[in-house]
A protein has these predicted regions:
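Phosphate-group recognition and catalysis centered on beta-loop-alpha active-site segments
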Residues: 1-176
């Protein structure tokens, strides 16, 4: 992904413009309003299927919240038919020709995401966010084909040292 500090691009957020969180509508709404890509969060089902989920849960029509990691994809889809596999979101984002920022909270899903992104030819247009600085650096070192951004809990006082450390570990960027 080509990026400089002079290039600005706006990504649509999950649930933007009063769309439902964890769905495809925010990708379309953002694209319609001129966003240059989209952001979404993923969670992994008990049988290893990555799905859109902003909080790690799937919402059943009756309002029940089901932890995604506790159920198989089939069980989740039966209880929450609107549940979206991440592959559908990636394909939609690809057709919108924008950048993708995927929030992951567990690095175990990176293997599946990498395969899905590579298959959709979106690997170079995707940033993985949501991992702490140390974990992100470790993941970036082991996965040089992924653009990993490290999360900072707060802005440190030694900015130059931090930027240098991020560059030497292979991080795509930092986010505070």
């Amino acid at each position: 992904m080509y990026y400089t500090n002079k290039e600005t691009f706006v990504l649509s957020a999950d649930g933007c413009m009063d769309t439902e969180r964890g769905g495809l509508e925010s990708i379309l709404a953002g694209n319609d309003e001129g966003a240059k890509g989209c952001c979404f969060s993923v969670a992994m089902s008990a049988d290893g299927i990555a799905v859109l989920s902003s909080d790690g849960c799937a919402a059943a029509p009756d309002g029940t919240r089901l932890p995604v990691s506790d159920y198989s994809y089939a069980e989740l889809h039966q209880a929450a038919p609107q549940l979206t596999p991440v592959s559908q979101a990636i394909e939609l984002a690809r057709t919108c020709q924008g950048k993708i920022a995927i929030t992951v909270h567990d690095q175990t899903m990176l293997r599946q995401l990498r395969m899905t992104l590579r298959y959709a030819d979106c690997l170079d247009d995707t940033i993985i966010i949501g991992l702490g600085l140390v974990e992100a650096a470790r993941v970036a070192s082991a996965n040089p084909d992924l653009h990993i951004m490290g999360e900072l809990p707060n802005l440190p006082s030694e900015i130059d040292a931090l930027v240098n450390a991020a560059q030497t570990t292979g991080l795509f960027g930092l986010r505070a």
